[in-house]
């Protein structure tokens, strides 16, 4: 403590003032901060202390006496023990040699850390899980998607809940007809839809190259709908006519290759039935339905109808037209037309089927078409000959629409 003479005002140094505030009572010297935090290398405990020099009159220890029994593994620890002794002596005051240090406890093996890449419970906790099943009906060229339920979805609204729905998207394909969705369930994180959505016109080729994207979204009346999570199922994993059930963790949104979508985009599919009726002495052409049609209107839909034309037709009396279906890309027509013709003349004929978008006040838009007949190829030729060979038997086939028909009149 700083001393003062008689008559002088008492003064206290800053160090004494701090010591009094921190530790009332007798003032003791303030230790250096290094006394509280000695420097040791990481992983080396401060258990070793420097050995005091031996007194001059102490008998010298023989190397044999100073040596202790060692195991072969001790040799690998020589350097570590030397470092312990060296850094254990750092900053320590000299003193008598300590007694034998207690044996070190065996080091605990490091605990296994969760594998971030393979640890799925984080995503499950954050986004939720989805239960659904898929069935490919090979005979009817249909893919049935049953959306069962979801659990533990991520809250998206201010009330801590969500308004979830499920959206399906066949990839590749940018057409709006490739997208289907369930109804929306309000204020729930554990929705049960139990709803089946069906894609028609699915071929074996589609099952090899296409992938089904299943997204769970939150519907918002005042803003854009929000994405919650998704999963993707390559259709080649499915066996024909066999229901496969899934229970998966939703994942974060993955990018869609827009260039690939455009390059493989189609004009749509059409289901046509052919039958030569011996009773009516004519060809019965059935326009059953279309699927995945290209959108021609600004609202993202079309108002489609179908025309059929049996060529060549000198009198131009063979044109038939279905009714118009409003605002749809997957219309169902179920209409049939009869062409009176001898069976032997069919081999010389060509059936032209075109799909159009109806517009009021302007020209109708051509969506796509297909030609069946002697000059066709692949499935179109096979469908025509199967009809000729099997009288009085209705044969249905799906055909892909193209935007170019050689020799066709593409105006309505």
Swiss-Prot record:
Q: Write out the transmembrane intervals.
A: none
| Region entry Negatively regulates targeting to plasma membrane, spans | 1-36
Lineage start = Eukaryota, Metazoa, Chordata, Craniata, Vertebrata
PANTHER family given in the database record:
DOUBLE C2-LIKE DOMAIN-CONTAINING PROTEIN BETA, RABPHILIN, ISOFORM A
Q: What is this protein called?
A: Double C2-like domain-containing protein beta
A single GO BP term for this record reads: calcium-dependent activation of synaptic vesicle fusion
Q: Which organism is it from?
A: Mus musculus
Q: How does it sit in the membrane?
A: Peripheral membrane protein
Q: Supply the CDD domains for this chain.
A: C2A_Rabphilin_Doc2, C2B_Rabphilin_Doc2
Q: Name one Pfam family in it.
A: C2
Q: Where is the composition biased (Low complexity)?
A: 59-74
**UniProt region (Mediates interaction with STXBP3), positions on chain:** 257-375
Q: Where is the composition biased (Pro residues)?
A: 43-58, 95-108
Known function: Calcium sensor which positively regulates SNARE-dependent fusion of vesicles with membranes. Binds phospholipids in a calcium-dependent manner and may act at the priming stage of fusion by modifying membrane curvature to stimulate fusion. Involved in calcium-triggered exocytosis in chromaffin cells and calcium-dependent spontaneous release of neurotransmitter in absence of action potentials in neuronal cells. Involved both in glucose-stimulated insulin secretion in pancreatic cells and insulin-dependent GLUT4 transport to the plasma membrane in adipocytes.
Report the domain remarks: C2 domain 1 is involved in binding calcium and phospholipids. According to PubMed:19033398, the C2 domain 2 may also play a role in the calcium-dependent targeting to membranes.
> What does the annotation give as the result of altering residue 157 to N?
Loss of interaction with STX4 and insulin-dependent translocation to the cell membrane
Q: Which gene encodes it?
A: Doc2b
């Amino acid at each position: 403590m700083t001393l003062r003479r008689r008559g002088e005002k008492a003064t206290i140094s800053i160090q004494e003032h701090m010591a009094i505030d921190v530790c009332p009572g007798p003032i003791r010297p303030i230790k250096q901060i290094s006394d509280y935090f000695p420097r040791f290398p990481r992983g080396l405990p401060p258990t070793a202390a420097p050995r005091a020099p031996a007194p001059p009159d102490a008998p010298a220890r023989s190397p044999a006496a100073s040596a202790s029994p060692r195991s072969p593994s001790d040799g690998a620890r020589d350097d570590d023990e030397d470092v312990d002794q060296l850094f254990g002596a750092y900053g320590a005051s000299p003193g008598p040699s300590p007694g034998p240090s207690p044996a070190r406890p065996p080091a605990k093996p490091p605990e296994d850390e969760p594998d971030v890449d393979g640890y799925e419970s984080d995503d499950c906790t954050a986004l939720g899980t989805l239960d659904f099943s898929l069935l490919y009906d090979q005979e009817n060229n249909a893919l049935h998607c049953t959306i069962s339920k979801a659990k533990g979805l991520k809250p998206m609204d201010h009330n801590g809940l969500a308004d979830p729905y499920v959206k399906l998207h066949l990839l590749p394909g940018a057409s709006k007809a490739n997208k289907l969705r369930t109804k929306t369930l309000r204020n729930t994180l554990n929705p049960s839809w139990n709803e089946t959505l069906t894609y028609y016109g699915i071929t074996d080729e589609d099952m090899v190259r296409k992938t089904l994207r299943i997204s769970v979204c939150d519907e918002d009346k005042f803003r854009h709908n929000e994405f919650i999570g998704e999963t993707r199922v390559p259709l080649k994993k499915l066996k024909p006519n066999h229901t496969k059930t899934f229970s998966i963790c939703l994942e974060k949104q993955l990018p869609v290759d827009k260039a690939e979508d455009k390059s493989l985009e189609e004009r749509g599919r059409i289901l046509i039935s052919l039958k030569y009726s011996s009773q009516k002495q004519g060809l019965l052409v059935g326009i059953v339905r279309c699927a995945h049609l290209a959108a021609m209107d600004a609202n993202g839909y079309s108002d489609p109808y179908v025309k059929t034309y049996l060529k060549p037709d000198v009198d131009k009396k063979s044109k038939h037209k279905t009714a118009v279906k409003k605002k749809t890309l997957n219309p169902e027509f179920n209409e049939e037309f009869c062409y009176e013709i001898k069976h032997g003349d069919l081999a010389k004929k060509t059936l032209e089927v075109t799909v159009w978008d109806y517009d009021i006040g302007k020209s109708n838009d051509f969506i796509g078409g297909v030609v069946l007949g002697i000059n066709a190829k692949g499935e179109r030729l096979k469908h025509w000959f199967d009809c000729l060979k099997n009288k009085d038997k209705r044969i249905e086939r799906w055909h892909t629409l193209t935007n170019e028909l050689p020799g066709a009149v593409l105006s309505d």
